[in-house]
Swiss-Prot record:
Keywords: ATP-binding, Chaperone, Cytoplasm, Nucleotide-binding, Stress response. GO terms for cellular component: cytoplasm. This is Heat shock protein 90. ATP binds at N38, F125, R384. One of its GO terms (molecular function) is unfolded protein binding. Residues 226-264 have a biased composition (Basic and acidic residues). It is found in: Cytoplasm. SMART domains: HATPase_c. Its main location: cytoplasm. It comes from the Eukaryota. Homodimer. The gene is HSP90. Molecular chaperone that promotes the maturation, structural maintenance and proper regulation of specific target proteins involved for instance in cell cycle control and signal transduction. Undergoes a functional cycle that is linked to its ATPase activity. This cycle probably induces conformational changes in the client proteins, thereby causing their activation. Interacts dynamically with various co-chaperones that modulate its substrate recognition, ATPase cycle and chaperone function. Residues 212-264, 685-713 are annotated as: Disordered.
Length: 713
């Protein structure tokens, strides 16, 4: 036996080990990820060498990683059949020569970095001391004999030729002598969970030694023989052969010879493969079945349903990576929960899990897409949890967005599937319109809306444009609280009578989306409730409109005088046919619906609200009997109290029908009551109560004051 040699750790390594041992880290579990990752690297190396020299695999043909928990001795063994280490490798790699990243890692650690970054500096092996008092490494390289490396991290380590442990053939066995309080890492469930969490997609089988209890029926004489055999381990194999021979003789014959039988339990150790989910993304898409995709998706997402769509692709060129993306059938209830840690895209480098919360890998509007991205050469810096070059990420991100849009277009081909998809994720698409300027036009093609002509179906912008009226330039839409509300809106009266189709946008996020989406296929999007609406009219219609405008000019001036600064201007309308009047907003200000949405924001910016709330324009229908009668009354006496009351009443009703909220509901009710009394010819005794109402001028002043108060609120 070769003498044991003692070596001193390099100063930096000694300092690093001291830091690991004497500092408390909550996530000690990362040691297993690091050791499995190192084992995978060792297996990659021998597999690579065997491409040109196949005989190198003969010393141990199987490629595997094995975990062996031993509760009796309080040890956890991580074994692999990789390339192994020579004596020189053990001395140099595990102690005397510090890697370039050792110092940098300690600096990062002392600056508040995470212990889980250790593997990025090439010193992941030392994470073993997070859970172990001492570590034994047994290794066999094809070019050397089997050696043992041992250290209790006391500043030195020993190396000697091995004559104690079972021959490996080739590979490395790391034996962790666990600290007293780290027994959890001997539990079968804990080890399985850790492998599933961090190392499920390592491309080599990870096997766990598990104890299985089997019950079998034996004769009493057999039982006695087996008890004797248990005392001599080397005779066990012979006993099993004997048992096999006896089974062949038949149960009946055994019963005759030996009499009674009884059931006994025996415990055997078996290898259970933990990473059964093979990396599907490494295979060609045409080789993977739908069942495999479904199984993989469920394993990845913990979803109880199968996926709705899948995209399996690889990118080569500036950056090489493979990816597998899934669209779920339903959105999670907390899809837009801002505090939730995102973990939908898992990032791997050469099948080693790096992170699942990389915010830069996919935009927020695609946060429902689940999947895996695996790069062969993605550069990393301090940790597996932080990436070094944003340029690389931008390439990955750009490709993922492109492929997601392709996947959505594929879903679109099946109307029933797309209806399910759109019901669940339409808000995400609209958020994409708002946030993703580069892909806005493509996302717009995916949007669907109900319309004045679509009935229960939904229509796309493309379908709308294809069936536009001859000569129609703009795409008309209306925003509102519900389909029923917008369908009955006075703003649609003229458009629908002339046969124009109007899109109904009733989702609050539609307001934000159309602010960014100005046009589709060179057709401007035009809101029916705002100024600037152009409806094609004949020359005769235009002439009649101008004549009517001149006729109503005195009334329009009177309405502006009465309403004062409640409206910016009063004009004759060419957009309504059945309603007496409506209130429209400026083209670039908030619509009535947007105003309603913003007022509901608990944390709204009131200064912004007062700035964006548009000055309203009152549009009067010159063909409506009410407006004609008021015009006639005003021509007789423009200071008539009833005329002024009616103007205020029309303003309040226009607020409601145009989608605004009432500014003074009490005063509105008072005016209604006054009109009711007038209609019922209430006598003078009741009229006294009317005197309690403030005069119109005061009502107007109170409204102004309330408006100011709302701005301050």
């Amino acid at each position: 036996m070769e003498n044991k040699e003692t070596f001193a750790f390099n100063a930096d390594i000694q300092q690093l080990m001291s830091l690991i041992i004497n500092t408390f880290y909550s996530n000690k579990e990362i040691f297993l990820r690091e050791l499995i990752s190192n084992a995978s690297d060792a297996l990659d190396k021998i597999r690579y060498e065997a491409i040109t020299e196949p005989e190198k695999l003969k010393t141990k043909p199987e490629l595997f990683i094995r975990l062996i928990p031993d509760k009796a001795n309080n040890t956890l063994t991580i074994e692999n059949s990789g390339i192994g280490m020579t004596k020189a490798d053990l001395v140099n790699n595990l102690g005397t020569i510090a890697r370039s990243g050792t110092k940098a890692f300690m600096e990062a650690l002392q600056a508040g970095g995470d212990i889980s970054m250790i593997g990025q500096f090439g010193v992941g092996f030392y994470s073993a001391y997070l859970v172990a008092d001492s570590v034994t490494v047994v290794s066999k390289h094809n070019d050397d004999e089997q050696y043992v490396w041992e250290s209790a991290a006391g500043g030195s380590f020993t190396v000697q030729k091995d004559d104690k442990y079972e021959p490996l053939g080739r590979g490395t066995r790391i034996i962790l002598h666990l600290k007293e309080d780290q027994g959890e890492y001997l539990e079968e469930r804990r080890l399985k969970d850790l492998v599933k969490k961090h190392s499920e997609f390592i491309s080599f089988p990870i096997e766990l030694a598990v104890e299985k209890t089997h019950e079998r029926e034996v004769t009493e004489s057999e039982d006695e023989e087996e008890k004797k055999a248990d005392e001599k381990a080397e005779e066990k194999e012979g006993e099993e052969k004997k048992e096999g021979e006896e089974k062949k003789e038949g149960e009946e014959e055994k019963k005759e010879k030996t009499g009674k039988t009884k059931k006994v339990q025996e415990v055997t150790r078996e290898w259970e493969q933990l990473n059964k989910q093979k990396p599907l993304w490494m295979r060609k898409p045409e080789e993977v079945t739908e069942e495999e995709y479904a199984s993989f998706y469920k394993s990845l997402s913990n979803d109880w349903e199968e996926h709705l769509a899948v995209k399996h692709f690889s990118v080569e060129g500036q950056l090489e990576f493979k990816a597998l993306l899934f669209v779920p059938k339903r959105a999670p209830f907390d899809l837009f929960e801002t505090r939730k840690k995102r973990n939908n895209i898992k990032l791997y480098v050469r099948r080693v899990f790096i992170m699942d919360d990389c915010e830069d890998i996919i935009p927020e509007w695609l946060n429902f897409v689940k999947g895996v991205v695996d790069s062969e050469d993605l550069p990393l810096n301090i940790s597996r949890e932080s990436l070094q070059q944003n340029k690389i990420l931008k390439v990955i991100r750009k490709n993922l967005v492109k492929k997601c849009l392709e996947m959505f277009a594929e879903i679109e081909e099946k109307k029933e599937n797309y209806a399910k998809f759109y019901e669940q994720f339409s808000k995400n698409l609209k958020l994409g319109i708002h946030e993703d300027s580069a892909n806005r036009a493509k996302i717009a093609e995916l949007l669907r809306f109900h319309s004045s002509k679509s009935g229960e179906d939904m229509v796309s912008f493309k379908e709308y444009v294809d069936r536009m009226k001859e000569g129609q330039k703009d795409i008309y839409y209306i925003t509102g609280e519900s389909r029923q509300t917008v369908a009955n809106s006075p703003f649609l009266e003229k458009l629908t009578k002339k046969g124009y189709e109007v899109l109904y946008m009733t989702d609050p996020i539609d307001e934000y989306a159309v602010q960014q989406l100005k046009e589709f296929d060179n057709h401007k999007l035009r809101c029916c409730t705002k100024e600037g609406l152009e409806i094609d009219e004949s020359e005769e219609e235009k002439k009649k409109f101008e004549e009517l405008k001149a006729e109503f000019e005195p009334l329009l001036k009177l309405i502006k005088e009465v309403l004062h600064d409640k409206v910016d201007k009063v004009v004759l309308s060419n957009r309504i046919t059945d309603s007496p009047c409506v209130l429209v907003t400026t083209e670039f200000g908030w619509s009535a619906n947007m105003e309603r949405i913003m007022k509901a924001q608990a944390l709204r910016d009131n200064s912004m609200t007062s700035y964006m709330v548009s000055k309203k324009t009152m549009e009067v229908n010159g063909h409506h009997s009410i407006m004609i009668e008021i015009k006639n009354k005003a021509a007789v006496d423009k200071s008539d109290k009833t005329v002024k009351d009616l103007i205020w009443l029309l303003y309040d009703t226009a607020l409601l029908t145009s989608g605004f909220s009432l500014e003074e509901p009490t005063q509105f009710a008072a005016r209604i009551h006054r009109m009711i009394k007038l209609g019922l010819s209430i006598d003078d005794d009741e009229e006294a109560k009317d005197d309690d109402l403030p005069p119109l001028e005061e009502v107007e002043g109170a409204a102004d004051e309330a408006s100011k108060m709302e701005e301050v609120d």
